[in-house]
């Protein structure tokens, strides 16, 4: 397992900041906290580290400016609040960073910007250019146009996608939670704090609670989801409290936080994109034999597919689901949904007879696939990743 190291030894850091840290329900923007945060960012940049910020707070800030009532907002109310709040949020970041002569660059992303390959590459190029000229990208979901059906849903997973997109080696999630516990500490006095997480296992996933406040959409569940995306690409992750001023300095000085170790063998950029897809177009449900084959680094053949769900086209990302109902892999499917259903459970030699054309022998080729769950020991998986990535 890669050991934890000081922040100053990382090359590129993505910092996600929760709404509750930036915005007070009554007072609005927490200017003093933001100024202190920007001072921390300036300190990292002085060490030659690239810094990207995924900043929540647009809806919360707009809600404060518009004096909207407490409770859940309708979609159009959230979008209006985002439209008002995003301007104020961008201005606040720009003003605070400019105190240290740092330029801020605003980037608003929608789900398609990371899920569609061409737009993904374009967004990555824009972010990399901002970093090249020394600016700090301030990134948020474009809540003014995103709907409940086509959105990230929280900035934890957005931050993880940004980290993988830009090749960051550390993702820091700042919120009102100081890390991962074995159970919600406010409900269980015997809950144990976990300082180091070597691997996100099913047991770790089960520990994730549902803590979320009115000002934010995220909780520990989404942070663990973010960790799975980030660590699979070789990026370490830290969950830490941002309640104190200068939270990055606090982490550096030993404040309590949970550190998630990166995968020992980062996958290729293309496989990173596949693994991080937030909304697979469909699902392939497979049998135990297929699970064993995939764990050995082999392709998914039609014979191992028990059923097909969803509407997808050839080349779309699909989730591969094991007999227990848990996702074990993701990949680019070789057939559209209708043809996949027709050949599911059949031998590859029968494909041409069934479909009328000689398709690929594999439903999902191993070169187009990334494992998203544990099969076998970690050392065995790392050897396979090194062979097939």
From Swiss-Prot:
UniProt-annotated binding residues for substrate: 56, 143, 155
Pathway in which this enzyme or protein is active: Amino-acid biosynthesis; L-proline biosynthesis; L-glutamate 5-semialdehyde from L-glutamate: step 1/2
Organism superkingdom: Bacteria
GO CC annotation: cytosol
Catalytic class of the enzyme: transferase
InterPro entries named among the record's database cross-references: AceGlu_kinase-like_sf, Asp/Glu/Uridylate_kinase, G5K_ProB, Glu/AcGlu_kinase, Glu_5kinase, Glu_5kinase/COase_Synthase, Glutamate_5-kinase_CS, PUA
A Pfam cross-reference name: PUA
Keyword terms: Amino-acid biosynthesis, ATP-binding, Cytoplasm, Kinase, Nucleotide-binding, Proline biosynthesis, Transferase
GO MF, one annotated term: RNA binding
Reactions mediated catalytically: L-glutamate + ATP = L-glutamyl 5-phosphate + ADP
UniProt xrefs under SUPFAM superfamilies: Carbamate kinase-like, PUA domain-like
Keyword Aminoacyl-tRNA synthetase: no
The keyword Cell cycle is annotated on this UniProt entry: no
Family of this protein: Belongs to the glutamate 5-kinase family.
Protein's name in the database: Glutamate 5-kinase
């Amino acid at each position: 397992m890669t050991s934890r190291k000081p922040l100053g030894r990382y090359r590129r850091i993505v910092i996600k900041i929760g709404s509750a840290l930036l915005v007070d329900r009554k007072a609005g923007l927490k200017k003093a906290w933001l100024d202190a945060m920007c001072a921390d960012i300036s300190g990292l940049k002085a060490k030659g580290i690239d810094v990207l910020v995924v900043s929540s707070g647009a809806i919360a800030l707009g809600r404060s400016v518009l004096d909207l009532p407490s409770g859940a907002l309708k979609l159009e109310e959230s979008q209006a609040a985002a439209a008002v709040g995003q301007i104020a949020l961008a201005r606040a970041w720009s003003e605070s960073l400019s105190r240290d002569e740092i330029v801020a660059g605003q980037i608003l992303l929608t789900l398609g910007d990371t899920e569609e390959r061409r737009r993904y590459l374009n967004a990555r190029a824009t972010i990399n250019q901002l970093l090249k000229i020394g600016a700090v990208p301030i990134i948020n979901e474009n809540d003014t146009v995103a709907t409940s059906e086509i959105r990230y849903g929280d900035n934890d997973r957005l931050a993880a996608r940004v980290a993988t997109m830009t090749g960051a080696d550390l993702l820091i999630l700042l919120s009102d939670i100081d890390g991962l516990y074995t159970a919600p500490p406010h409900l269980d006095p015997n809950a144990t704090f976990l300082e180091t997480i070597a691997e996100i296992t099913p047991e770790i996933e089960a520990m994730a609670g549902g803590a979320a406040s009115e000002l934010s959409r995220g909780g520990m569940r989404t942070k663990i989801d973010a960790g799975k995306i980030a660590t699979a690409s070789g990026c370490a992750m830290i969950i830490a409290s941002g309640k104190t001023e200068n939270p990055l300095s606090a982490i550096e000085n030993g404040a309590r936080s949970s550190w998630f170790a990166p995968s020992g063998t980062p996958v290729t950029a293309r496989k990173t994109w596949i693994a991080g897809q937030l909304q697979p177009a469909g699902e392939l449900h497979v049998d135990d034999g297929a699970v064993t084959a995939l764990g050995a680094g082999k392709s998914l053949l039609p014979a191992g597919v028990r059923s097909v769900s969803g509407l997808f086209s050839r080349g779309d990302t699909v989730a591969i689901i094991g007999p227990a109902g848990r996702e074990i892999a993701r990949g680019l499917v070789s057939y559209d949904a209708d043809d996949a259903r027709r050949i599911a459970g059949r031998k590859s030699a029968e494909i041409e007879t069934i479909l009328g054309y000689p398709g690929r022998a594999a439903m999902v080729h191993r070169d187009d696939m990334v494992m998203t769950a544990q099969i076998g020991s970690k050392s065995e998986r790392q050897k396979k990743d090194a062979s097939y990535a």
